[in-house]
């Protein structure tokens, strides 16, 4: 028991330190529209200031729509399982996991959406203006509400599964963690190739989702420990 408590305490200490460290790292090393953002966005703009991948089928239809629809389907299943657990006895034991996975993920996604709706940061494709010879960046552009990256959140919210299963099924937990990181990054990168976001937009999305999960997990850790005990 004491060993388990020490492990949980260490887990939270490490994650709080990482959250604070990464917060300042993003502010200092990855400022929105900073050198790294500009360096990584340049390859996707032609000489006239046009993002040539903006209407690319694979990036727009496959990444922006189909992949998101698949992830949405996964969460519809979790919601369905949670609802079914009130009627189906064999699902009752997993009700907490199903509900936590769905509702905490939705809170994380909704928070990103709320921050984005209130943001003054424009999308890269709204910041580029053609000139007679080339193009210029307008960093005063305010329309767009593009920070943080909303699309990437659909991938990053899968990281919630890491917290759901870390005590009972570590392999499944790491599957969700790795899948969430990879999907969030890839979905965000594809949007960057289209000119919809800077890299920093998506990195902040990942940070917000992780912070939300740490907050909820801190509050709910005792319930997860209880769920583990009753299944043993």
Residue ranges and their predicted role:
Residues 29-30, 37, 79-83, 111, ...:
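Alpha-helical membrane-inserting segments
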């Amino acid at each position: 028991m004491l060993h388990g408590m020490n492990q949980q305490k260490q887990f939270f200490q490490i994650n709080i330190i990482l959250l604070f460290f990464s917060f300042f790292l993003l502010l200092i090393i990855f400022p929105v529209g900073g050198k790294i953002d500009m360096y990584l966005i340049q390859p996707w703009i032609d000489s006239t200031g046009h993002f040539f991948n903006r209407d690319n089928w694979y990036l727009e239809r496959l990444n922006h729509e189909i992949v998101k629809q698949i992830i949405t389907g996964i969460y519809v299943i979790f919601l369905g399982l949670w609802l079914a657990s009130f009627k189906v006895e064999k699902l009752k034991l997993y009700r907490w996991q199903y509900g936590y996975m769905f509702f905490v993920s939705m809170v994380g996604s909704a928070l990103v959406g709320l921050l984005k709706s209130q943001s003054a940061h424009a999308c890269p494709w709204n910041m580029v203006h053609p000139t007679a010879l080339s193009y210029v960046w307008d960093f005063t552009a305010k329309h767009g509400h593009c920070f943080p990256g909303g699309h990437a959140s659909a991938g990053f919210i899968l990281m919630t599964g890491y917290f759901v299963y870390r005590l009972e099924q570590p392999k499944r937990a790491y599957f969700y963690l790795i899948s969430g990181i990879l999907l969030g990054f890839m979905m965000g990168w594809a949007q960057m190739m289209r000119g919809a976001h800077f890299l920093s937009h998506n990195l902040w999305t990942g940070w917000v989702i992780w912070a939300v999960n740490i907050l909820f997990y801190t509050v709910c850790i005792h319930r997860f420990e209880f769920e583990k005990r009753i299944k043993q």
